[in-house]
Structures are given as C-alpha cells and as structure tokens.
C-alpha cells in the first residue's frame, strides 16, 4: 500500500473538522425507529412492519415511520436539551478520533479510529434531525468542543497507539454512562429520541470493545477522573448553550 504524505493526513483532518462542525451531517444508516409504531387503528405494530421503501428514501433525514409523539412544552424543552448534549458529545467524539487518527502510528489503528468516527457521523445526523423535529438547535459551542477534543486526541495518540486506544475505551465507557442517564431522564413518551439513544449506546459499546480488543490499555485513574470532569463541563454548558 502506498504511504500518504503527512501533509495529506493534515489536509484530510482539516476537511473532516470543517464538515463535522459546520456542514449538515449525513447518515449512512436510517434514523432508528421506535420498538412499536402506531397504525391507523392506533394499535401498536411490530417494528419492521412499516414500509421498508419509505425508510430508505432519505437516509440522512428523520424517519417518517417513527411515531408522531405529542410532548408538552416542558417535555419538548427537556428532550431538546438532552439531545443537544448528545449531539455535542458526538462532536467531541469525532474530534477525539480525528485527532488520534492524525498521529496514529499504525494504519490499523488509524483505520479503526476513522471507522468509529464514521459511525459517530450517523449519530450526529440522527441528533440533528431530532433537534429539528423538536424545534431546537445544536450547541453554539460546538467549535470549542471540537478544538478541545481534537487537541486531546492528538496528545493521547502521541503517547502511542495502545494508550490512544485506551482513551477510546474510557471515552466510550463514559459515553455509555451518559446515555444511560439520559435514557432515564427523557420524557416517557419521547420514543423517537429514546430509539436514537438506544442505537447510539449499542454503537458506543461496540467501539469500546473494538478498541480494547485492538490492544487498548487501561488509563490511570487520575486521567479517567480528569476526562469525567471535562465531560461534565461540556454537558452542563451544552444543555443550555
């Protein structure tokens, strides 16, 4: 395989950054559907009984087969705030992986990181679509989240691929915890957001397992604690801004 010039990696990283922060996200998978969907008789029917073709018409936009949930104003604001936090978290995750991939020492590690980042793009698109449905927006601080996480990714990868992959394991473990919390805090009737977060959680667990299997090492406790504090700052700010 022909090796790429370092400048090529830098240009690609800049392109990924601009797309992640400023361009509309495009998903390679449909927006996850709720487990049950009401039919005209208002009788729940199993997921998968809806029109398959309609699911695949536009893989980057909201899936119209999802239930039309009527939320109160307070519930809508709560769901929107939580989905904005999740979107900001996906921006940060993309930046972390992009920064790590930029200085990864092996092609295998770089490929694993970019593959995970690609799935995070699906998460971005899903969260964006849901925020639009809720009449809300993404965090105004997304450029800040991206820059900070990208720098952390570069620093993590500079210590070696095994430590870099350990950051992925720890990041995904913490993200899983955040998603568990948000699933409990979502309004009970918001099945659309819940379906999205359920699939995101499944993907994040897979990313962490893949990084661990690839040789990711356990991070020192102080580093894990620092990551938790940084995440708390981001989630608190993104909830409101």
Regions from the language model: what does each represent?
Residues 1-241:
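Non-heme di-metal
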């Amino acid at each position: 395989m022909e090796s790429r010039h370092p400048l090529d990696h830098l240009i690609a990283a800049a392109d990924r950054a601009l797309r992640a922060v400023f361009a509309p996200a495009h998903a390679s998978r449909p927006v996850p559907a709720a487990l049950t969907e009401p039919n005209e008789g208002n009788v729940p029917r199993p997921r998968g009984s809806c029109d398959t073709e309609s699911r695949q018409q536009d893989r980057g936009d909201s899936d119209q087969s999802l239930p039309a949930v009527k939320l109160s104003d307070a519930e809508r604001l709560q769901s929107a705030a939580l989905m904005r936090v999740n979107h900001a978290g996906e921006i940060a995750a993309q930046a972390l992986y992009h920064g790590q991939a930029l200085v990864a020492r092996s092609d295998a590690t770089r490929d694993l990181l970019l593959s995970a980042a690609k799935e995070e793009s699906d998460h971005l698109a899903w969260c964006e679509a849901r925020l639009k449905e809720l009449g809300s927006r993404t965090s105004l601080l997304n450029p800040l989240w991206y820059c900070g996480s990208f720098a952390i990714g570069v620093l993590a990868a500079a210590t070696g691929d095994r430590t870099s992959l350990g950051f992925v394991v720890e990041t995904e473990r913490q993200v899983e915890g955040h998603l568990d919390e948000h699933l409990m805090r979502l309004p009970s009737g918001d099945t659309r957001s819940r379906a999205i977060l359920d699939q995101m959680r499944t993907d994040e667990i897979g990313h962490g397992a893949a990084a661990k299997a690839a040789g990711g090492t356990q991070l020192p406790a102080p580093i894990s604690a620092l990551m938790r504090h940084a995440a708390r700052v981001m989630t608190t700010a993104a909830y409101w801004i």
